[in-house]
UniProtKB/Swiss-Prot annotation:
<feature type="active site" description="Charge relay system">
    <location>
        <position position="358"/>
    </location>
</feature>
<keyword id="KW-0719">Serine esterase</keyword>
<feature type="glycosylation site" description="N-linked (GlcNAc...) asparagine">
    <location>
        <position position="484"/>
    </location>
</feature>
<keyword id="KW-1003">Cell membrane</keyword>
<dbReference type="GO" id="GO:0005886">
    <property type="term" value="C:plasma membrane"/>
</dbReference>
<keyword id="KW-0472">Membrane</keyword>
<dbReference type="InterPro" id="IPR050654">
    <property type="entry name" value="AChE-related_enzymes"/>
</dbReference>
<feature type="active site" description="Charge relay system">
    <location>
        <position position="471"/>
    </location>
</feature>
<dbReference type="InterPro" id="IPR000908">
    <property type="entry name" value="Acylcholinesterase_fish/snake"/>
</dbReference>
<dbReference type="GO" id="GO:0045202">
    <property type="term" value="C:synapse"/>
</dbReference>
<dbReference type="InterPro" id="IPR019819">
    <property type="entry name" value="Carboxylesterase_B_CS"/>
</dbReference>
<feature type="active site" description="Acyl-ester intermediate">
    <location>
        <position position="231"/>
    </location>
</feature>
<keyword id="KW-0732">Signal</keyword>
<dbReference type="InterPro" id="IPR029058">
    <property type="entry name" value="AB_hydrolase_fold"/>
</dbReference>
<feature type="disulfide bond">
    <location>
        <begin position="285"/>
        <end position="296"/>
    </location>
</feature>
<dbReference type="Pfam" id="PF08674">
    <property type="entry name" value="AChE_tetra"/>
</dbReference>
<dbReference type="GO" id="GO:0005615">
    <property type="term" value="C:extracellular space"/>
</dbReference>
Length: 606
């Protein structure tokens, strides 16, 4: 769990990043482009701006509303479609991010602050942004980005999500959308109309509906929409593949480092209700029913909810988040695991993958012995405590199984190996093996699946070398940031970014990421019999036979069976101890009686 204090805003961005944002007052609209910057939609007209990129321009339409502001009584409710407007809407600047916790763990450190809101925060936050090639295309493929952030943070306006490079180089339309996070988006009382849960997912769905109805005037093809996201954004993409009411709103899907079946991605209705009630108690609410609880929570200012939301977690852990999607019987008719195994999902082409060190980023947020400011060499005692926090739902037997699986028993006190093992445990458990299981379930239904492992560490990465290729650090290559000369990427990294943008765009166009210009050959499909994947780095495309097959068999098959078999072991042990105590007491009583009998004077035999 992050150790940061919410409410503090990040330090100002360096001047070169501020220039990158190209605020409207700095951008001249060239003659002949003015017509491209006004678009009429079903909800009203919008006027965007022209942004310079490389040796050309793209048109950007920033801050278009797709829902009514979820203010006042609309807090915790399903979103309502935006009402039409009559004026020409100024769409030349980003809108504020949705209210969320701000990471102040390392003040002034851009490695963390690059993920913090950079446009302020508001509950009035349901807007989307569109980047369009210039000149405006006709029926271009559309890529829709859903940001990650553990369902408690994230913003569509982050610099790393700047859509101009991907739009310009690949002649695609890029859309980024906002959705409510934390308690505002995922506090759930399933069955109650006051706070049904999954509001953030419904925000996303409403944005996808707006795109279906309105992307054509921007030059996009509503029948060629690919939804993509990273981490909780990837989990969201997977959830729309599962939810029957979302499936018709897009054609293809890309999941980067996340899936709907991840252990952190959903909670049960009982757990969701328990967390909502605990938040109310933490905020001093007195309530006898759902309406009274929600009424009290609506009376609190946003920062009060943010300050207390992490207190609802039931155990000390990392890679667990306070308010997440709930299995409500509506958006989700069943658990993601059950829906995937039964084939109850949208059958389509899927591109998915992970980065090399998925766990390292999370280790510094609470595991003993870890810090970005040292080598984080981990003692055996800290390793064992780290395992317990990394698998918080596991009983002692399952925890021991994880320790057994990841320990080098010939060198168990090696602090570097203990650090690397915890990196692997957190990454395998929370990201890699859920993604592998998702890919396997899709491949079994003969859907086209393409898989990757991104294992290039950026030359300008701010995180220490021991963290390797951390969670989230393929995104800059997908969005083309290395093409910005001021960010000091190497020529090889610029080429890697160009390749990755081509892969993603080719997939959006055709359902196959293969780049015809790539001499390395075709990107193989991932099948049930041949679960192949490619490595994405500065070297030529290389195919590998399977992704952590042995270790994912442990997480996806063995450990669930072990947990199921030992689910009642603590109760059985308690009953055994109670019965043993009763038996022991009985035996002590019998022995006492027997000793007393032996001491009695007895008549001699006649």
């Amino acid at each position: 769990m992050p150790s940061c204090q919410p409410g503090k805003m990040p330090a100002p961005w360096p001047w070169w990043l501020q220039l990158l944002l190209c605020i409207p007052s700095c951008v001249a609209v060239l003659p002949g482009r003015a017509g491209e910057l006004k678009v009429s939609t079903q909800t009203g007209s919008v006027r965007g701006l022209s942004l310079p990129v490389l040796d050309g321009h793209v048109s950007a339409f920033l801050g278009i509303p797709f829902a009514e502001p979820p203010l006042g009584r609309m807090r915790f409710l399903r979103p309502e479609p935006v009402k039409p407007w009559q004026h020409v809407l100024d769409a030349t600047s980003y809108k504020p991010a949705c209210y969320q916790m701000v990471d102040t763990s390392y003040p002034g450190f851009q490695g963390t602050e690059m993920w913090n809101p950079n446009r302020g925060m508001s509950e009035d936050c349901l807007y989307l942004n569109i980047w369009v090639p210039s000149p405006r295309p006709k029926d271009a493929p559309v890529l829709v980005w859903i940001y990650g952030g553990g369902f408690y943070s994230g913003a569509a306006s982050l610099d790393v999500y700047d859509g101009r490079f991907l739009t310009y180089t690949q002649n695609v339309i890029l859309v980024s959308l906002s959705y409510r996070v934390g308690a505002f988006g995922f506090l759930g009382l399933p069955g109650s109309p006051e706070a049904p849960g999954n509001m953030g997912l419904l925000d996303q769905r409403l944005a996808l509906q707006w795109i279906q109805n309105n992307i054509h005037p921007f030059g996009g093809n509503p029948r060629a929409v690919t939804v993509f996201g990273e981490s909780a954004g990837a989990a969201s993409v997977g959830m729309h593949l599962l939810s029957t009411q979302s499936r018709t709103l897009f054609q293809r899907a890309i999941l980067q480092s996340g899936g709907p079946n991840a252990p952190w991605a959903t909670v049960t209705p009982a757990e969701s209700r328990g967390r909502a009630a605990l938040l109310g108690k933490q905020l001093g609410c007195h309530f006898n029913n759902d309406s009274e609880l929600v009424s009290c929570l609506r009376s609190k200012n946003p920062q009060e909810l943010i300050d207390e939301e992490w207190s609802v977690l039931p155990y000390k852990s990392i890679f667990r988040f306070p308010f997440v999607p709930v299995i409500d019987g509506d958006f989700f008719p069943d658990t993601p695991e059950a829906m995937l195994s039964s084939g109850n999902f949208k059958e389509t082409q899927v591109l998915l993958g992970v980065v090399k060190d998925e766990g390292s980023y999370f280790l510094i947020y609470g595991l003993p012995g870890f810090s970005k400011d040292n080598e984080s060499l981990i003692s055996r005692a800290d390793f064992l405590e780290g395992v317990r926090m990394s698998v918080p739902h596991a009983n002692d037997i399952a925890t021991d199984a994880v320790v057994l699986q990841y320990t080098d028993w010939q060198d168990q006190d090696n602090r570097e190996k203990n650090r690397e093992a915890l990196d692997d445990i957190v990454g395998d458990h929370n990201v890699i093996c859920p993604v592998v299981q998702f890919a396997n379930d899709y491949a079994k239904r003969n859907s086209k699946v393409y898989a990757y492992l991104f294992d290039h560490r950026a030359s300008n990465l701010l995180w220490p070398p021991w963290m390797g290729v951390p969670h989230g650090y393929e995104i800059e290559f997908v969005f083309g940031l290395p093409l910005n000369d001021s960010l000091n990427y190497t020529p090889q990294e610029k080429e890697l970014s160009r390749r990755m943008m081509r892969y993603w765009a080719n997939f959006a166009r055709t359902g196959n990421p293969t780049d015809p210009a790539d001499k390395s050959g075709a990107w193989p499909t991932y099948t049930a019999s041949q679960p192949q994947y490619v490595q994405l780095n500065t070297q030529p495309l290389a195919t590998q036979p399977s992704l952590r097959a042995q270790i994912c068999a442990f997480w996806n098959h063995f450990l669930p069976k072990l947990l199921n078999a030992t689910d009642n072991i603590e109760e059985a042990e308690r009953q055994w101890k109670l019965e043993f105590h009763l038996w022991s007491a009985y035996m002590m009583h019998w022995k006492s009686q027997f000793d007393h009998y032996n001491k009695q004077d007895r008549c001699s035999e006649l």
